[in-house]
A protein has these predicted regions:
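N-terminal Rossmann-like NAD(P)+-binding subdomain of aldehyde/semialdehyde dehydrogenases
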Residues: 1-112
Length: 112
C-alpha cells in the first residue's frame, strides 16, 4: 500500500516540506501517513503575505462564508474526501478507523 502524504497548506497552496512526521498505528507501529511540517521561519515568511489571504476573504460575504463552511462540514461528515496527494479517497468510516488506530481512542469516543 502506498502511504499517503499530507502536505502543509501555505496560503491555500499545498506544500511538501522536507520536515515530515510519521503518523503511526499505536498498536503495531505501522505508518498510516506522513505529514509535512513547517518551522517558525516558514510561518513568519507566510505572515508577511497574510494581507493577500485577508483580501481574498474580504471579497466574500458573510453568507457566502457560512455557506462554504456548511458545505465543508457536510462533506467532512458524509463525503469521501481526498487523502494526501495521490488522489486516494477516504470515507467517513475510514477516517474514524484511522483516527482511532493512531490516537488509541475507541471508535465510540472518536465518533462523538
Amino acid at each position: 500500500m502506498n502511504t499517503p502524504h499530507i502536505p502543509c497548506l501555505r496560503l491555500g497552496e499545498e506544500y511538501r516540506s522536507f520536515n515530515q512526521s510519521e503518523v503511526k498505528d499505536y498498536r503495531d507501529g505501522s505508518v498510516k501517513a506522513t505529514m509535512s511540517q513547517v518551522n517558525a521561519g516558514v510561518v513568519r515568511r507566510d505572515l508577511m503575505q497574510i494581507q493577500k489571504a485577508c483580501d481574498a476573504l474580504q471579497k466574500l460575504s458573510t453568507r457566502e462564508l457560512i455557506d462554504i463552511s456548511s458545505k465543508a462540514g457536510d462533506l467532512f461528515l458524509n463525503g469521501n474526501l481526498p487523502l494526501g496527494e495521490n488522489g486516494k479517497l477516504q470515507s467517513p468510516q475510514d477516517y474514524l478507523e484511522t483516527l482511532s488506530s493512531t490516537s488509541g481512542l475507541p471508535h465510540v469516543m472518536v465518533k462523538r
